Each structure stands twice: as C-alpha cells, then as structure tokens.
Design a protein with these regions (language model features):
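Bacterial extracytoplasmic/cell-wall-associated proteins, especially those involved in peptidoglycan
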Residues: 73-77, 88-239
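Signal peptide-directed extracytoplasmic domains
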Residues: 1-128
C-alpha cells in the first residue's frame, strides 16, 4: 500500500478507504508495473495477480555457456546450471533446446522453462523421425550433433543444405570434418578469439575435428530447425 501511495501521490488513508469500500482485502504477491498508471488500474492488477511478464530468447547458435549467462542475467532463478536438471534421453546436455521466445514471471524457476524447451525439441525430432525417411544413415543423436556444426558454419539459411552435403560427404568417405567451430567449442569457456596452429594440432581436444575422425561427442550449440532439416534431408554432395 505504501509503495502504491508513494508512486501515485495518493494519501495512504484515502487509499485504505478506497480498498475498504471496494471490498478489496488482499493483494496477490508478485512484481507489478505501477508507474504512470491510475490507482484503480494498479489496485485491479494487484487484486487479480496481473504481474509483469518477462521473456527470454533462446537463440539458435547459443551454447551452454552463453545460455547459463543469459539465465543469470534474467529474472529467472537459475536452479539448472548448465542444464544439469534436464530430464533427457540424450547422453549430452548441449544443444538439446528448441530455439524460441519463452515467457515467465520474476522468480520463476529456470528449470521449468528449460525442460519445456527441451520437450518441444524432443517432440519435433520424434515427429520428424516418424513422418519421413531419413536421407542418410545418421541417427537422431548424430543428426543433432551435425546440425549444430552446420548452424555455426552457415552464414545464412541458403548455405545450410550445401554445408550439410559437404559434411555428409566427408563422413561417408571417412574424412575428417575439419570444422573450425568445433575447435572453438572445445576451447570454451577460455577461447580468446583466435584459433592457433597449436589448437588445430591439439589431439587432446575431443572436439577438434581436424584431429578426430567422425563427429564430436556432442552438439556444439543449439540448432535451428532449418539446420536440423538440412541434415535430416541432406545427401552427400560431390564436393
């Protein structure tokens, strides 16, 4: 009541009478926008629980480190550091979210948003798997890994089919992918912005596709739906 009166230049006694005559006995707790609003609208919002809605944008191309910072900078309670809380069938925690804008209230648990996002991706992948034939021999885990590399390599959506074809061709011929974004991911969170020759020759980096054969052990970022489709429907190209 004091806060409402203070920001709306209303006498506190008058405000109490207003509440009494309108039979308003309690307010619902939460975060409210009271600035510049008439008192009647504020009282209505607080009585109905019309709290402020925030949004968080989970972008394609986001990795698990950036995501953790994004959550820490939001109004969410980060009870799910590095997706540790997610219930999933995948044997990795990177790149398992559906990119989109999600809405929440201040103090909501991040785990609820993240699990919802993961479940959306899982549903999409299940529908994709059963709706059409895969053009290559990759399983869903491998598709998600490769699509994340395509996501980080592509400058725009038009390039994704071509890039997917190049990587599928290399996999089919047992060639190394040689994708710079995988090296960078293996150096996180301490990558300084410059890939050095020693990084390219580093056999201890399990994400270094210049040194390892086949795919890295997990995705390197969240994939867009267009990247997933490019890999799922992709065929080895003659490149």
């Amino acid at each position: 009541i004091s806060e409402v009166a203070k920001h709306n230049f209303v006498n506190k006694v008058f405000l109490k009478y207003f509440l009494y005559f309108n039979k308003i006995k309690t307010f619902k707790s939460g975060e409210y926008d009271i600035y510049g609003k008439p008192m009647s609208e504020i009282i209505f919002d607080m009585n109905e629980g019309n709290t402020i809605t925030h949004k968080i944008l989970i972008n394609e191309g986001t990795n698990i480190y950036d995501l953790n910072n994004l959550i820490n900078d939001s109004m969410l309670v980060n009870d799910c550091q590095f997706l540790s809380c997610i219930k999933t069938d995948f044997n990795f925690k990177e790149g398992i979210l559906y990119p989109d804008t999600y809405f929440y209230k201040k103090g909501n648990l991040a785990s609820n948003i993240l699990q919802k996002s993961h479940d959306r991706l899982k549903k999409y992948l299940d529908e994709l798997k059963y709706s059409q034939n895969n053009n290559n021999n990759l399983d869903i885990n491998e598709i998600l890994i490769l699509s994340s590399i395509v996501e980080k390599e592509a400058g725009n959506n038009n390039e994704k089919k071509l890039i997917a074809g190049v990587f599928l061709n290399r996999l089919e011929k047992n060639m190394r992918l040689q994708a710079d974004p995988t090296i960078i991911y293996g150096l996180l969170p301490n990558f300084d912005g410059d890939i050095k020759k020693s990084n390219i020759l580093d056999r201890n980096n399990k994400y270094n596709t210049y040194m390892i054969n086949g795919l890295p052990p997990s995705p390197i970022a969240i994939s867009s739906i267009s990247s997933i489709d490019a890999v799922f429907n992709g065929k080895p190209g003659k490149f």
